[in-house]
C-alpha cells in the first residue's frame, strides 16, 4: 500500500508546475504555470544548450518583423520595455495616432489651451503716418505742427480743420525749427509733441483775439479776404462755413491725403493774417464747440432768417422717441433673458414667457401676468420712461395697432312714424308675397295639373321610382320622347359610349396597377386572391438572383402557408421575420443573410415541398364568387325573383286581385256558417267591417304612415 503522502505528491516529478493535486505539471489547484522544459524533462530531455532561458524560444517572434529582417537583441528589449499597446505594426500605430488626433480636433475650442504672447513694441499708427508724410513731402514750408500731431489715447479724437493766423516772422521761425528738427526726428517724445501742440494752439487763440479786437469793421474782413485771395495761388483755403457745417467730409479727405500744405506770404502791415491748416483728431462735438469759441463773430457765416425759423421749429417740435435698443440705457437689461411667444388681453393682460428667473425652467413657456413682468423688468435695469418701448420690442409685432375706425353716422328721427313703417315692412315680409287675386300664370298651373300623372300629391308622397341610376339605365322610354325619335337615339348612343369608355378606363387602370406591382414586387396586388406553390418558389428564385433587393414580403396566409414559406426560406438559407399585428394583418418578411451567399439552395428539399399543398388562399381577402354561382344562389327558390310583381309608389295592394270563387273551400265553409256576400264576419251584434283595410305601397320611405 503506498503512503498517503506519496499520493498527494503524485506527479511532482513532472516539473516545477506540479503542486497540490497537480498532475504532471498541469495547471491544478495551486499548480504553477507549466514550463516547456519541466513538463518533458523525464521523458524527452531537451537538446542543445540546457542553460538557455525560457524566453529564448518566444524571442524569435520579437526579433523578426513582417519581412523576416533580423532585429538586434537590444532593440527587442527596448521595444518590450515600451508602453504596451494593442497595436504592433507601423500602420496600426499610425492609425492609433490619427484616431487620437481626431479626438483632439473634435473637442471644443474653449477647452483647448491658449497661450498669450506679449508684444515687444506698442503698435502706434501715427509713426507710420508720419513716415509716409515725410516721404511724400517735397516742400520745405510745411509747418512743424502738422507733422507733430499724434493721437492721444486718453481722448476719442476725430480729425477736423482749424485756421492758424500768425505773423510772417513766426512762420519763418517755424520753418527754421522744422529744418532743425528734421535732423532729430528720431529723438522726439510724445510729451514734447503734446506740449508743442498746446503752445501752438494758445498762440493761435491769442492771435484770433487780437484780430477780433483790432478789426471791428467790415473793411478789415474784406482786407483779410483780399489777403486770402493772394495766398490761394499756393494753397486752396477751405471755406470756414463748410468746415463748421460739414466737418466729416473734410476729415476723410485730410486722412486720405495724410498731409497738409501751407505756404506763407510776407506783408509789411502788422495786421497781416496768414492762414494755416491744422488737423487735430478730436470728437465731432468737441470740434464744433472749439470752432464756435475760437472763431470770432466776423468769421462766422451770417445765418439767414429762414434758418432761424427752422431752428425754432425744430426746437418747438419734440423728436419721436427712438425704438428700444438705440439708447445706451437700454443695454442695462439683458434682453436675451426673456422671450415672449404669445400675448393675450383680458381683465389682466398676460404674456407667454420663457424666462429662467420668472418661470424657473429654461425651455418651458408659462403664462405670467403683465404686472409681474413689469416689476421684474424694472428691477433688472429697464428705465420706467422706456417701458412701453420695451414691451413693444419683446412682443415683436404681436400686437397690431389698429387705427380707430370712424363711427358711422346714425340718423335719429324726431317722430315714431318711421319706426312704425319699419314694423309694417317686417310684418309684410313674413307673409306670402304671392298675389292670389291676380290671374297671372294661371294657365301654366292648369297645364301642369293636367300633365302631372300624380295630380296634387304632396312632394313627400310622390313617386320617384322612375329615376333609374345611370349605370342601370339602358333606354329613355320613361321620358316623353315619343315624337322626337332622333333625340332618344342620340341619348342612347351617348349612354353606350359612356359605359364603354368607363369600362375601358377601368381595365387600363387595373393593368397599370398590375404592372407597377410587378415592377415594385408588390405581392398584395400581384396575387389578389391566392398563391400557388410554384409562384412562391419563383419569388424566392427572383430574390436570390436580384442583387439590388435584400428582402420581400408575402401576403397574409394561414398557419400552414406560413410554415411552408419558412421551410422554403430554410432551403434558400434566408431568415424569416414576423411582421404586422396578430391575426389577419400578420405576414412574413424574407431577408437575405450571410449564409445566402455562401451555400447553394437545397433543391432536393424544395422539390419535396413542391409536391405538397399546391394553393394557398389569402385570409385577409374575402373569396370572390363567379357570376354563374352568384346568379344560382339568388334563383335557388324556383326563380321567384323573375315572377315577382313590381309595384309603384301609392298602389293599393291586392286592388287588381280576382274575387275568390264559390268553388273555394274556405268560401264554402263561411257560407255554411251564415256569411253572406257584402256582410261582415261574426254573429249579430259583433260583426266586423264590410270593406277590408287598404294597404298602399311606399318605396320612398320605410315604416307605416
Curated annotation (Swiss-Prot):
Segments of skewed composition (Basic residues): 1-11, 41-53, 624-635
Gene Ontology cellular-component annotations: cytoplasm; nucleus
Localization (cell): Cytoplasm; Nucleus
Stretches with biased composition (Basic and acidic residues): 194-203
Biological process terms in GO annotation: mRNA processing; RNA splicing
Keyword Coiled coil annotated: no
Domain G-patch: 662-705
PROSITE patterns linked to this entry: G_PATCH
Positions of the UniProt region annotated as Disordered: 1-61, 152-272, 287-325, 398-439, 616-648
InterPro entries xrefs: G_patch_dom, R3H_G-patch, Splicing_assoc_domain
Protein name per its UniProtKB record: Protein SQS1
Gene designation per UniProt: SQS1
